[in-house]
Regions:
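Conserved catalytic scaffold of divalent metal-dependent phosphoesterases
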Residues: 85-175
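Active-site-proximal beta-strand elements of phosphoester/diester hydrolases
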Residues: 2-13, 122-131, 150-154, 198-201
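Divalent metal-coordination and catalytic microenvironments
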Residues: 8, 43, 48, 64, ...
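Conserved beta-sheet core of the metallophosphoesterase superfamily
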Residues: 163-229
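Core catalytic region of metal-dependent phosphoesterases/phosphodiesterases
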Residues: 2, 9, 13-117, 176-180
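Active-site environment of divalent metal-dependent phosphoester hydrolases
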Residues: 10-14, 51-54, 81-92, 118-119, ...
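Short, conserved loop/helix-junction motifs that constitute active-site signature segments
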Residues: 72-75, 142-146, 174-179, 251-253
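Accessory, non-catalytic peripheral segments of nucleic-acid enzymes
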Residues: 222-343
């Protein structure tokens, strides 16, 4: 049986931004076309369906119902949704969670807040929601006892990319999952795998560190265990390297967030016209980076190719401190995301 797997949708992200929700809609047209074309009746959601674990914007909830849950219900799809860290209200238990409280009107939505084995299309699957202080023992026991060869969940496993360029050092040891033939997980937003454990990545760009990193969802066949990525062709973030005389298709950047890296600007008037033309094309936001220090080109190349998180994390790794660097990295990432929500 062919199923669809999607994860880390983060409805209501960026302070329930209309700009981002309109961008998300472009992806969901592709998603639902695949659902209909392939007559898919089972959708598996691997967590973090909503963005804010502490509160929900009512308009974000209505948007999710109108554009996602109502459509799945009308298509006759059963949705298995795993509780992730963003949908669990408390950090030490999954008992209070957004998907259970907000989606009770949908009989087709099955919320998984504790480790549960479910057979889909003849395939036994162990579903593992966010592991915390309360459920860790029960989760480990469920993993030990199950005969399922496939596990799916919202997991934090060490040794995989949290985002492009940064491997997570904290998390559960991957050897805990060695009994499974395949493990499919949400949580990390970039795709990575070791041919047994697969982080599937989220459907769309949300932050600058998502730039030029493939996004989308997956089709999974429960009979032959084939996993097929369906990429999202739409982008939110663009980076332009500016030179005198550059020619661009301004329409490409409508309702997008653009970073202009100035590598040459001998004609100031021409540059001003370029920026004005970007705004005339209804660009959502323009960031300009200028650096003409030719004495240190390696540093400029490094900075222009990296995003804020990776630059700071590299600084942390190279610093001299007795503190646990992986924990400092994690704290900074949380602060960075909170800051992004405020702009």
């Amino acid at each position: 049986m062919l199923t669809a797997i999607i994860t880390d949708q983060h409805f209501g992200c960026r302070k329930n931004s209309d700009l981002f929700h309109d961008y998300f809609l472009q992806f969901y047209e592709i998603f639902f076309k695949n659902i209909e074309d392939n007559n898919i009746k089972t959708v598996i959601d691997l967590g973090d369906t909503f963005d804010n674990r502490k509160s929900i914007d009512f308009s974000a909830l209505q948007w999710a119902k109108d554009n996602y849950y109502d459509r799945l219900r009308d298509l006759g799809c059963t949705v298995y949704t795993v509780v992730g860290n963003h949908t669990a209200y408390y950090k030490n238990t999954n008992s209070v969670n957004a998907v259970d409280l907000l989606l009770r009107e949908y009989d087709n939505v099955k919320v998984i807040s504790e480790p549960t084995e479910i057979t889909i299309g003849g395939l036994p699957i162990l579903f593992i929601p966010w592991i915390n202080q309360e459920n860790e023992y029960d989760t480990l026991m469920a993993m030990k006892k199950t005969s399922a060869k496939v596990a799916m969940g919202h997991l934090e496993i060490a040794g995989f990319y949290a985002y492009k360029g940064h491997v997570m050092e904290e998390g559960h040891d991957k050897n805990l999952f060695k009994k499974f033939d395949y493990v499919f997980s949400g949580h990390y937003h970039t795709r990575s795998d070791n041919s047994q454990i697969y982080y599937l990545g989220n459907p769309y760009e949300m932050y600058w560190n998502d730039l030029n990193d493939e996004r989308g969802f997956h089709l999974f066949n429960t009979e032959n265990l084939l996993l097929e990525p369906i990429n999202n062709p739409y982008r939110m973030f663009y980076q332009i390297e500016y030179y005198d005389g550059i020619e661009v298709d301004y329409d490409e950047y409508k309702n997008k967030i653009v970073k202009v890296i100035v590598k040459q600007k001998n004609n100031v008037s021409e540059f001003d016209d370029f920026i004005n033309d970007l705004y005339k094309a209804d660009v959502a936001e323009v960031k300009i980076v200028e650096n003409f220090n030719t004495e240190e080109p390696p540093m400029f190349e490094e900075l222009e190719s990296e995003h804020t998180i990776s630059i700071v994390n590299k600084y942390i790794q190279e610093s001299t401190t007795d503190l646990e660097k992986s924990k400092i990295n994690k704290i900074f990432e949380e602060v960075y995301k909170e800051a992004c929500e405020m702009i």
